[in-house]
């Protein structure tokens, strides 16, 4: 639809803050965490409370294990050294342990130690069972609620966006909602799922363990825990900084995603003007802020991790020294305040609590990220639409609508450009059943009237009346159900032809669909297609020619049988014969209903009951055609500017009515019997009826989504990823060394810890203090080394991962934009699907060399070193401790397998949801005009619910497997120390070696479990890498010739200059059963202007696309001068010779100057050249009249300009290129007659001295061509200049006569 006045966001010269911003998108502070659960039902709140209780129960096992472990190890020291019972114990006596002994013999101590071991094993087994059961619910409950939450979030966000008014969409054009629905919502899910349960478990565990430590020994606890406030503050500020960095990162990625969508949806324009390299560079520039923010996040994470772990070992050093001093001071006191048991409980309570707090850091980061992502999303969700299309409010007329329309003193300006006034007191009255044409220069406000009547916008002042009632009083759905519109640039949706027509009347029968298509002149070409009405039309109708799309759009409007028909350049893309047929159908359809016509064609407006000439936002003239011609005013001048002169002899020859009708019938028959076909093809087909169509499309998608993916070779994929990251190898090597060092450090601490128990057993206080001092210094050294290597490990792997992600995004985008155009015709490569791959899989791949790989290397190092140390001290106990490893490894492998099987299907369904979202939001005007809001919301909801099902299947065993891994470690503690106690009681093992072996191996196995938990992320990274490498490895079918291009003697002797098509046979790759060109031969000599004419869909534009090498012919050759464009010229060499102005010009979300300069991406185009090109295209005057002139932003896809203004910018863009060959594909179809004459003069001047190929239905634009070629049945059937073809009296002459009389 035409947009009549520039209405853009701020120019580049203005700051971002000055630019108008859509409501709900203003920057704001992150929301409170609990508000993330705002979409929970009462039942889900109950589940959350239950999950919280389970987390608390699970947390209680921590202090219980601390007490049990401390009591047992204290008894171990007492029994082994025959000190007697130095501590009162409370847990061990529950199952026969903890007997009090005084002056007992070694045998009695050994028997008591045996009982202690059995009691310890039973108690810890009970704790393991409790942890297992509570752990299952603490994971699954939060995952379940989070999944339901984000499903609702996605649906509510999409629904809110779809329900917003068009003015809001104009302002929000830079916001990438599709990416937000995928990435941002997924980050919210990550922040409110099982991580909440883990966080509650850690915090509650911290509180309880610290409280118990204080209750047992407040002096030691106070001394050791003095650093905990520092830990809490550090976590708080790190989370705060990372939240801000995350917001910056998301903003950058949103900009990159928006650019990617714009470029991929406009790939033909990008390719035509050689913009691939510059767009890739712009995309990379968008990624820079995100990369820098991520690097800072990595640095903060590394610093936090280093400080927390260093403080942990420092506290151990302090606890060792201070605790031993307290015990020695109390050795000779009868009522001892500190004993080994109390020391262990207080010490372990603080260590476990501090470790819990340290482990909350990544969770806090996830929560901060979730809050940041949710802030703007929730504002959009909460936003109340000013014009809500799904509102049930408003009046519905039960008695029917008459159709009286009146614009009453209307003042209007677009929300995105409030300083530009479009209407200035517009007054128009249209009686029911009248046909009224709105005319005027391009950009005067005609199409704005159409949009106001549809209530896309509301007037700033004044009112639009329908049956004497302000349209704001009517229900919007009811209002739009009585209005049908056919726009200048028709938008069709991915699906079948039948489905697209039925969108005008949901539930229409096949008979009604065919009747509407016949009335619109589309039935003939549809039935000539192999799949007829079941034929798929591609994304945005890409499988159809412009004329075919327009006829489908007209059929879609006619099937609605509206009270008011709005025709905004409805026949601009049709040839004149088709236009006559369709115009007759529209004239017939106009009977009995109010019709408003916006057109530059005299044939479309001459028969109107009233013609309204609009100038400067006001009505300048109105009346019938004859009245206005008699007035000889502005309308008269506009009509005269479009007159076409014909030779007198031809007029006489064809003056007899019968002869004219016979000629028309012959011409019509010749076109109707030709093999009308798609200009591009499709893959799938479905049945006719609407319900069956949707069911079969859904089934097809389901089969596609559920098809087993090609199994990737993980080793080869990982090798390629490492090769891709070779620039970061030095970081990876140093990071690997650091990760290995971290893995070695804990076994070293376990040995120190075991020696500390030996120090407690020293009877001489001096020896005990001396050994403790050495161990404390060793802990200090360990703290320093741990801090250093932890920082390096986290930062370096994050650094390498971020660079890999950034590089992979850029490389994938580069590979996409360099594919041949036919690749984008495949529905599997829709814009939404490709954007989802860029934003999703390129992020997933970071797991291959980022933190997951780091954790796995650390765990492997730790496990190997732990096994080595344990085997050194006691191989029997070591093997027993390793018994839980198969359980852990098996659990993780099982989980990884289940997740990897679901991840590809999940991504495919998400891509389909993204396609629906992208298609709907991008074409929101068409969605609104067709009242499809509820339909697209339902379709999107169905896909998102399928995503929920797949994720639920993926996570169904998550709680069990996670709890198995954690509980198995506790159970292993029970078995290991129980058996170790037996060995000590039998004199086979020193007691301190039990501590060394068990601590070393059990921590190693837990680390193995934690690292193997990264396996799903690592597996997902390899799957993502495999899918991205498929894109990177794909060689475009259209490439520059290989090797050196030779200048052969034959080429030197070939003196031909110009463009030559020889024996061209062609079918579109996605439509191999439909032949487009059948042996076409055509020569365009250097400097000639050659026009191609023929029926809509005959293949005229195909000739241009083959010349641009969008496709290559199946047979035959195309030459530019003496060079075969396939074998003798590079792609760039071909396209730099060409300048294109297409029927539906695509402009970018940039300034007018940047869009014009886009015509030549090989160099920096000066402002002088830009202005000169604009003047040549008759665009300079309207550009400088804008407040920001050439710096005016264009809006998404140039929506801030009228159709005529966009076309003139496109012409200027082609002229600035100074091409050798100029291609004009309906270059003036969107212009009013006056502007067309001026622009045509400019084009005539531009064509002077260069070769031009012109495609046009309006013969006024081609009558001065040197050669005119009529294409029929894929061949040139007539050619000559205008006078020659007229004198021949053939097809062209009859077509010309038709237009003259029309």
Curated annotation (Swiss-Prot):
This is Multidrug resistance protein homolog 65. CDD domains: ABC_6TM_Pgp_ABCB1_D1_like (cd18577), ABC_6TM_Pgp_ABCB1_D2_like (cd18578), ABC_MTABC3_MDL1_MDL2 (cd03249). GO terms for cellular component: ATP-binding cassette (ABC) transporter complex; membrane; pleated septate junction. ATP 1 binds at residues 440-447. It is found in: Membrane. Keywords: ATP-binding, Glycoprotein, Membrane, Nucleotide-binding, Repeat, Translocase, Transmembrane, Transmembrane helix, Transport. Residues 70-118, 216-223, 324-341, 754-776, 874, 978-993 are extracellular. It holds the Pfam family ABC_tran. The chain crosses the membrane at residues 49-69, 119-147, 195-215, 224-242, 303-323, 342-362, 732-753, 777-798, 853-873, 875-894, 957-977, 994-1014. The gene is Mdr65.
């Amino acid at each position: 639809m035409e947009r009549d006045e520039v209405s853009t966001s701020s120019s580049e010269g203005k700051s971002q803050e000055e630019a108008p911003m859509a409501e709900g998108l203003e920057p704001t502070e992150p929301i409170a965490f609990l508000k993330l659960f705002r979409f929970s039902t009462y039942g889900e709140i109950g589940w959350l409370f239950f999950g919280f209780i389970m987390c608390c129960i699970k947390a209680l096992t921590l202090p219980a294990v601390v007490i049990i472990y401390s009591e047992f190890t204290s008894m171990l020291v007492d029994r082994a050294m025959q000190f007697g019972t130095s501590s009162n114990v409370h847990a061990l006596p529950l199952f026969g342990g903890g007997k009090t002994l005084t002056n007992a013999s070694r045998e009695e101590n050994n028997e008591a130690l045996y009982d202690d071991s059995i009691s310890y094993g039973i108690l810890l087994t009970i704790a393991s069972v409790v942890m297992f059961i509570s752990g299952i619910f603490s994971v699954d409950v939060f995952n379940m609620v989070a999944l339901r939450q984000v499903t609702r979030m996605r649906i509510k966000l999409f629904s809110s966006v779809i329900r917003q008014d068009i003015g809001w969409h104009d302002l929000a054009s830079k916001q990438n909602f599709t990416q937000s629905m995928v990435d941002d919502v997924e980050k919210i899910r990550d922040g409110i799922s099982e991580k909440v349960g883990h966080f509650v478990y850690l915090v509650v565990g911290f509180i309880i363990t610290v409280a118990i430590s204080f209750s047992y020994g407040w002096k030691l606890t106070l001394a050791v825990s003095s650093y905990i406030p520092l830990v809490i503050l550090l976590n708080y500020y790190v989370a705060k900084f990372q939240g801000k960095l995350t917001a910056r990162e998301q903003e950058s990625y949103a900009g990159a995603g928006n650019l990617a969508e714009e470029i991929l949806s406009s790939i033909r324009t990008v390719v035509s003007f050689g913009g691939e390299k510059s767009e890739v560079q712009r995309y990379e520039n968008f990624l820079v802020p995100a990369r820098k923010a991520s690097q800072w996040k990595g640095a903060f994470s590394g610093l936090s991790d280093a400080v927390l772990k260093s403080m942990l070992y420092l506290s151990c050093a302090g606890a060792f020294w201070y605790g031993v001093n307290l015990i020695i001071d109390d050795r000779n006191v009868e009522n001892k305040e500190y004993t080994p048991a109390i020391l262990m409980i207080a010490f372990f309570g603080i260590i476990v609590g501090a470790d819990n707090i340290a482990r909350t850091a990544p969770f806090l980061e996830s929560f901060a990220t979730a809050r940041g992502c949710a802030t703007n999303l929730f504002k959009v969700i909460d936003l109340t639409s000013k014009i809500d299309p799904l509102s049930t409010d408003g009046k519905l007329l039960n008695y029917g609508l008459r159709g009286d329309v009146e614009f009453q003193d209307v003042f209007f300006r677009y929300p995105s450009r409030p300083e530009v006034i479009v209407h200035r007191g517009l007054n128009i009255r249209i009686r029911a059943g009248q046909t009224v044409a709105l005319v005027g220069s391009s950009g005067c406000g005609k199409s704005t009237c159409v949009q106001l009547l549809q209530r896309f916008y509301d007037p700033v002042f004044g009112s639009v009346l329908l049956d004497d009632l302000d349209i704001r009083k009517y229900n919007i759905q009811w209002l739009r159900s009585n209005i049908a519109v056919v726009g200048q640039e028709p938008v069709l949706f991915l699906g079948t032809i039948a489905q697209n027509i039925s969108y005008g009347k949901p539930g229409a029968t096949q008979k009604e669909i065919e009747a509407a298509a016949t009335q619109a002149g589309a039935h003939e070409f549809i039935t000539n297609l192999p799949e007829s009405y079941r034929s798929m039309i591609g994304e945005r109708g890409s499988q159809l020619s412009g004329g075919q799309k327009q006829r489908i759009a007209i059929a879609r409007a006619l099937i609605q049988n509206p009270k008011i028909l709005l025709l905004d350049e409805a026949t601009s893309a049709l040839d004149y014969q088709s236009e006559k047929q369709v115009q007759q159908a529209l004239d017939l359809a106009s009977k009995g209903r109010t019709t408003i016509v916006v057109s530059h064609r005299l044939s479309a407006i001459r028969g109107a009951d009233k013609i309204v000439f609009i100038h400067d936002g006001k009505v300048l003239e109105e009346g019938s055609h004859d009245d206005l011609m008699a007035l000889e005013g502005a309308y008269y001048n506009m009509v005269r500017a479009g007159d076409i002169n014909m030779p007198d002899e031809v007029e006489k020859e064809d003056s007899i009515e019968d002869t004219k009708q016979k000629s028309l019938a012959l011409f019509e028959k010749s076109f109707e019997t030709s093999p009308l076909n798609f200009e591009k093809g499709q893959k799938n087909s479905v049945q006719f009826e609407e319900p069956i169509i949707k069911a079969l499309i859904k089934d097809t998608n389901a089969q596609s989504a559920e098809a087993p993916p090609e199994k990737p070779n993980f080793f080869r994929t990982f090798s390629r990823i490492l090769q891709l990251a070779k620039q970061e190898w030095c970081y990876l090597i140093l990071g690997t060394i650091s990760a290995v060092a971290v893995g070695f450090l804990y076994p070293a601490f376990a040995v120190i810890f075991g020696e500390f128990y030996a120090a407690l057993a020293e009877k001489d206080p001096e020896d005990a203090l001396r050994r403790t001092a050495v161990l404390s210094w060793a802990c200090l050294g360990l703290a320093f080394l741990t801090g250093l290597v932890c920082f390096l490990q986290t930062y370096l792997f994050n650094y390498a991962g971020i660079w890999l992600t950034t590089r992979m995004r850029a490389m994938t985008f580069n590979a996409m934009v360099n594919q041949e155009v036919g690749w984008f015709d495949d529905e599997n490569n829709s814009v939404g699907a490709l954007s989802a791959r860029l934003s999703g899989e390129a992020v997933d791949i970071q797991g291959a060399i980022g933190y997951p790989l780091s954790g796995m290397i650390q765990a492997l190092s730790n496990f190997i070193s732990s096994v080595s140390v344990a085997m050194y001290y006691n191989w029997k106990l070591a093997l027993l401790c390793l018994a839980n490893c198969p359980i852990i490894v098996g659990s993780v492998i099982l989980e990884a397998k289940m997740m990897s099987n679901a991840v590809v299907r999940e991504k495919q369904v998400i891509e389909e949801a993204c396609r629906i979202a992208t298609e709907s939001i991008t074409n929101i005007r068409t969605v609104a005009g067709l009242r499809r809001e509820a339909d697209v919301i339902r379709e999107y909801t169905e896909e998102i619910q399928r995503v929920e099902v797949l994720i639920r299947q993926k996570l169904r065993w998550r709680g069990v497997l996670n709890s198995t891994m954690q509980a198995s470690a506790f159970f292993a503690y029970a078995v290991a120390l129980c058996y170790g106690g037996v060995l000590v009681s039998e004199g086979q093992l020193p007691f301190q070696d039990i501590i060394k072996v068990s601590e070393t191996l059990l921590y190693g196995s837990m680390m193995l479990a934690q690292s193997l938990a990264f396996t799903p992320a690592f597996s997902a990274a390899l799957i993502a890498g495999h899918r991205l490498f498929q894109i990177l490895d794909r060689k475009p079918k259209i490439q520059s010739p290989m090797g050196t291009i030779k200048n052969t003697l034959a080429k030197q002797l070939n003196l031909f200059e110009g463009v030559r098509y020889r024996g061209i046979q062609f079918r579109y790759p996605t439509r191999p059963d439909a032949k487009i060109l059948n042996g076409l031969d055509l020569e365009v000599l250097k400097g000639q202007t050659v026009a191609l004419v023929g029926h809509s869909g005959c293949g005229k534009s195909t000739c241009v696309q083959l010349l641009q090498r969008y496709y290559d012919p199946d047979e035959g050759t195309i030459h530019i001068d003496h060079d075969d464009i396939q074998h003798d010229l590079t792609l760039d060499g071909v396209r730099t010779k060409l300048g294109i102005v297409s029927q539906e010009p695509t402009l970018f979300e940039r300034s007018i100057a940047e869009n014009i300069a886009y015509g030549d991406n090989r160099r920096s185009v000066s402002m002088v050249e830009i202005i000169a090109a604009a003047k040549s295209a008759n665009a300079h005057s309207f550009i400088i009249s804008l407040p920001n002139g050439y710096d005016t932003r264009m809006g998404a896809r140039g929506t801030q300009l009228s159709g005529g203004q966009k076309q003139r910018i496109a012409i200027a863009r082609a002229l600035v290129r100074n091409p050798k060959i100029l291609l004009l594909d309906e270059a003036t179809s969107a212009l009013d007659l006056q502007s067309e004459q001026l622009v045509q003069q400019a084009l005539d001047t531009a064509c002077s001295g260069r070769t031009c190929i012109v495609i046009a239905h309006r013969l006024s634009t081609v009558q001065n061509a040197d050669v005119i070629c009529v294409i029929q049945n894929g061949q040139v059937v007539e050619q000559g200049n205008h006078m020659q073809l007229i004198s021949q009296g053939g097809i062209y002459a009859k077509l010309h006569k038709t237009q003259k009389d029309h």
